[in-house]
């Protein structure tokens, strides 16, 4: 039987309010709290909460044989705490099953890793501290923003205490190699690399509801046959 690694990524930014020229020097609060509340609450009830309930149900129905992982940004955690705390209660239940791993990522879902290693480390530590405080878990795997990875980053990830990293299974990098294997980082062999299967992931993320797609509708049986 093949092992399937499910990773679900959650991020919600703080949205900026309309800021006019005449507000400069007078109004120093830049965020649209009403819009943040509306979007985060709506998305949580339409997507995040039903998905988390489904994951919890699958874990319970399969006696822990079903496993998954979740990467959630610090910004998202802040907003859920403020607007939809019941979703965090669900994530806490998932954490307690021992079948859902929490993966670290930059607190602000930023691009700090590209040019500011100290800021990147600070944000990652902030996320890890928040996950430890809220769910009692310590991440050992990291998913950088948009799955960004480069060899110079690997030693820093090891220094931060990570054993593995998720990254993109980019065709132009892999060439003939498959994304369905665990690789070692060339610059830090202790770091394991898990690659996203672009096709199988995008079949769910983007093509699932596309009625113009040649494989629509995507059924469970069809998807399982592709995995095999």
What are these regions (language model features)?
Residues 1-141, 147-202, 207-209, 213, ...:
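Catalytic alpha-helical scaffold of carbohydrate-active enzymes acting on polysaccharides/glycoconjugates
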């Amino acid at each position: 039987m093949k092992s399937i690694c499910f990773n679900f990524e959650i991020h919600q930014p703080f949205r900026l309010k309309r800021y006019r020229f005449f507000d400069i020097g007078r109004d120093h609060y830049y965020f649209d709290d009403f819009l943040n509340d509306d979007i985060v609450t709506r998305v949580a009830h339409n997507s995040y909460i039903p998905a988390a309930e489904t994951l919890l149900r699958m874990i319970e129905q399969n006696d822990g044989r079903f496993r998954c992982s979740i990467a959630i940004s610090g910004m998202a955690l802040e907003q859920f705490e403020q607007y939809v705390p019941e979703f965090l209660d669900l994530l806490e239940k998932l954490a307690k099953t021992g079948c859902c791993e929490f993966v670290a990522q930059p607190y602000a879902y930023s691009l700090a890793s590209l040019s500011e290693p100290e800021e990147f480390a600070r944000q990652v530590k902030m996320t890890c501290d928040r996950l430890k405080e809220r769910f009692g878990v310590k991440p050992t795997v990291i998913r950088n923003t948009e799955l960004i990875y480069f060899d110079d980053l690997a030693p820093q990830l090891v220094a931060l205490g990570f054993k593995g990293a998720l990254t993109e299974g980019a065709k132009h990098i892999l060439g003939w190699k498959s994304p369905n294997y665990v690789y070692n980082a060339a610059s830090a062999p202790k770091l394991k690399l898990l690659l996203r299967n672009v096709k199988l992931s995008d079949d769910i993320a983007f093509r699932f509801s596309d009625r113009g797609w040649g494989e629509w509708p995507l059924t469970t049986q069809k998807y399982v046959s592709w995995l095999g």
